[in-house]
């Protein structure tokens, strides 16, 4: 039976296609917008049955041209939190997604989509409750608004609807994202280029490099998506993080030590990395004061209650794995 992945040439989408392939699923239709042509690299080692542009796909799917479709993994969206064109953002992230969900409901197709932790904005609590959702930008609002529609539709939905609020995802196939790529990716390239990693210094009551995020490997993101794919009776909106915040220091130290090990050098402690100038702290930029979250940590109790019990990779495990993947491809 056919499976469709939108945003298939993107970061999470291409990892999902690969994850489906690893389970023997090759009847996968990839949907994307290849205006940024370099994204095609993410699909070179994937098996797909067809490729469609996102604009052509929506109407064709609504007409039922693909026959019985088991599931749609909707990862396609504008994920640039700095985008200020609200009309474009709402059309692309909200209206398109709404139309796709309606078609899935009409056809009895599982609908698994990407929401975002940006729905929480400045909240200090990261739990899937309306009272904690305070998006700070139009990207977050586009995801927030669609989640509200989903909540209204869930009681009457006859097929699966699952939204995943991704936290800070890192891992293979994100190179095309540029400045929106993960901290791990940027730390890796910065150290290879300059021999040092720079992090923000003291700010918000946090010591240098101790501002923290809920960093999650794309490997775990794929596993959770496939878990719900295997359990079409489970619907809802779920946080998708590890449930454990880790400081930026952990990312930087793991990146540097993994690169050192690849060169046959010993691992160093955080203090030693700082003493040797391999990790530097810079003054917190004035432009970000009052606009920067120093701490995010997902509440994954709802995800666990829904039956997902697998452990999540720590930064030390996941980022090291990712760095080795990058090293292999850097030559």
Curated annotation (Swiss-Prot):
Q: Which family does it belong to?
A: Belongs to the NAD(P)-dependent epimerase/dehydratase family. HldD subfamily.
Q: Kindly state the subunit structure of this protein.
A: Homopentamer.
> What does the entry list as the binding residues for substrate?
168, 179, 186, 200-203, 213, 292
Catalytic residues (UniProt): 139 (proton acceptor), 177 (proton acceptor)
Lineage, top-rank taxon, reads Bacteria
Free-text comment on this protein's domains from its UniProt entry: Contains a large N-terminal NADP-binding domain, and a smaller C-terminal substrate-binding domain.
One term of GO molecular function: ADP-glyceromanno-heptose 6-epimerase activity
| Disulfide pairings | none
Under the heading PANTHER family, the entry gives: ADP-L-GLYCERO-D-MANNO-HEPTOSE-6-EPIMERASE, NUCLEOSIDE-DIPHOSPHATE-SUGAR EPIMERASE
Its name, as the record gives it, is ADP-L-glycero-D-manno-heptose-6-epimerase
NADP is among the record's keywords: yes
Q: Which cofactor does it need?
A: NADP(+)
Q: Report the cofactor remark.
A: Binds 1 NADP(+) per subunit.
Keyword Cell membrane belongs to the record: no
EC class of the enzyme, as a word: isomerase
Pathway note: Nucleotide-sugar biosynthesis; ADP-L-glycero-beta-D-manno-heptose biosynthesis; ADP-L-glycero-beta-D-manno-heptose from D-glycero-beta-D-manno-heptose 7-phosphate: step 4/4
Residue sites binding NADP(+) per the record: 11-12, 32-33, 39, 54, 75-79, 92, 143, 169, 177
What reaction is this protein's catalytic activity? ADP-D-glycero-beta-D-manno-heptose = ADP-L-glycero-beta-D-manno-heptose
Per the UniProt entry, the Enzyme Commission number(s) are 5.1.3.20
Return any one Pfam family short name.
Answer: Epimerase
Tell me the GO BP annotations in alphabetical order: ADP-L-glycero-beta-D-manno-heptose biosynthetic process; carbohydrate metabolic process
Function in brief: Catalyzes the interconversion between ADP-D-glycero-beta-D-manno-heptose and ADP-L-glycero-beta-D-manno-heptose via an epimerization at carbon 6 of the heptose.
This protein's UniProt keywords: Carbohydrate metabolism, Isomerase, NADP
What is the residue range of the signal peptide feature?
A: none
Q: Which organism is it from?
A: Cupriavidus necator (strain ATCC 17699 / DSM 428 / KCTC 22496 / NCIMB 10442 / H16 / Stanier 337) (Ralstonia eutropha)
């Amino acid at each position: 039976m056919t499976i469709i992945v939108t945003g298939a040439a993107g970061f999470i989408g291409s990892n999902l296609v690969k994850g489906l392939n690893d389970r023997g699923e090759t009847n996968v239709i990839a949907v994307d917008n290849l205006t940024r042509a370099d994204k095609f690299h993410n699909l070179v080692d994937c098996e797909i049955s067809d490729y469609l542009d996102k604009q052509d796909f929506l109407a064709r799917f609504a007409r039922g041209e693909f026959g019985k479709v088991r599931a749609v993994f909707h990862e396609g969206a504008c994920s640039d939190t700095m985008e200020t064109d609200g009309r474009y953002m709402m059309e692309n992230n909200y209206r398109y997604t709404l139309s796709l969900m309606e078609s899935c409901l009409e056809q009895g197709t599982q609908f698994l989509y990407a929401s975002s932790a940006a729905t929480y904005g400045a909240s200090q609590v990261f739990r899937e409750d309306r009272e904690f959702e305070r998006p700070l930008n139009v990207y977050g609002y586009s995801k927030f608004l669609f989640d509200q529609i989903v909540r209204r539709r869930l009681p009457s939905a006859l097929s699966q609807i699952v939204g995943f609020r991704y936290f800070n995802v890192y891992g293979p196939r994100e190179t095309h994202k540029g400045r929106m790529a993960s901290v791990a990716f940027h730390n890796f390239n910065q150290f290879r280029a300059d021999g040092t990693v720079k992090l923000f210094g003291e700010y918000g009551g946090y010591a240098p490099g101790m501002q923290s995020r809920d960093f999650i490997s794309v490997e775990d993101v794929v596993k959770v998506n496939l878990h719900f794919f295997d359990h079409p009776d489970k619907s809802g909106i779920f946080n998708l993080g590890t449930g454990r915040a880790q400081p930026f220091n952990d990312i930087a130290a793991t990146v540097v030590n993994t690169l050192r090990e690849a060169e046959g050098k010993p691992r160093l402690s955080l203090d030693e990395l700082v003493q040797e100038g391999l990790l530097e702290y810079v003054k917190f930029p004035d432009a970000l004061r009052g606009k920067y979250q120093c701490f995010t940590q997902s509440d994954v109790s709802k995800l666990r209650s829904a039956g997902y019990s697998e452990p999540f990779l720590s930064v030390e495990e996941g980022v090291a794995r990712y760095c080795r993947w990058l090293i292999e491809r850097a030559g």
